[in-house]
Amino acid sequence: MHYYRYSNAKVSCWYKYLLFSYNIIFWLAGVVFLGVGLWAWSEKGVLSDLTKVTRMHGIDPVVLVLMVGVVMFTLGFAGCVGALRENICLLNFFCGTIVLIFFLELAVAVLAFLFQDWVRDRFREFFESNIKSYRDDIDLQNLIDSLQKANQCCGAYGPEDWDLNVYFNCSGASYSREKCGVPFSCCVPDPAQKVVNTQCGYDVRIQLKSKWDESIFTKGCIQALESWLPRNIYIVAGVFIAISLLQIFGIFLARTLISDIEAVKAGHHF
């Protein structure tokens, strides 16, 4: 039996530092997401009383920001250290996680296309759940307001969905000043007004439905998003393809570097 030493095998500095630079962006983005999330929780007093996390209603957008931050920070750290230290274990972790995320994204996209009714029902439940908690969380409130203003919509299927919120409910048991109203983000903007009128939605739903469209958006946000997607399908597809290509590029760099390291290690065993 003869053993040969591959004396020409070496780790490419080009791939090594390109992968390091690639992951620095991941790591820094993770730091930013974590910083923003922790700052937002600090502003709401969650950090000083962690039991508030379990008492939150609806979906707290900050949780999503923190989750993305943790994943990006962890991947960036593993990729940076793995590339600099030529650590196959960390590089395999980075590569494997990116591959997993890539296929999860692909699966979600395919399932969302095949089961559109199910997705629509889940989004309705999500929106209605957060309508109920509209006044409980400032971040959630800003998210819904931004969604309604950007899409010129109101509620999940229409303004009447705001009956789900205790403050906007039209029942006789409610003594809220916002009773039978909608949030200001449902209001049709007046170009003549330079200052946002946050009370423009008060008592709107007391009027006849035929007059609602004079002052508020009557289209539901689910319908608005369903109309928005076909009009912007090329933008959505472009973003998805760009993210996928970045992930594939990262996988390629990691696998190439792993192969170089393994070749060098194999060359030392003779």
Curated annotation (Swiss-Prot):
InterPro entries xrefs: Tetraspanin/Peripherin (IPR018499), Tetraspanin_animals (IPR000301), Tetraspanin_CS (IPR018503), Tetraspanin_EC2_sf (IPR008952)
Keyword field contains Membrane: yes
Transmembrane segments: 18-38, 62-82, 93-113, 233-253
Single GO MF annotation: enzyme binding
CDD domains according to UniProt: TM4SF9_like_LEL
UniProtKB keywords: Cell membrane, Disulfide bond, Glycoprotein, Membrane, Transmembrane, Transmembrane helix
Cytoplasmic side: 1-17, 83-92, 254-270
Organism: Homo sapiens (Human)
Gene3D superfamilies associated with the record: Tetraspanin
GO cellular component: cell surface; endoplasmic reticulum lumen; plasma membrane; specific granule membrane; tertiary granule membrane; tetraspanin-enriched microdomain
Disulphide bond pairs: 153-221, 154-186, 170-180, 187-200
Chain spans, region Necessary and sufficient for interaction with ADAM10: 114-232
Protein name: Tetraspanin-14
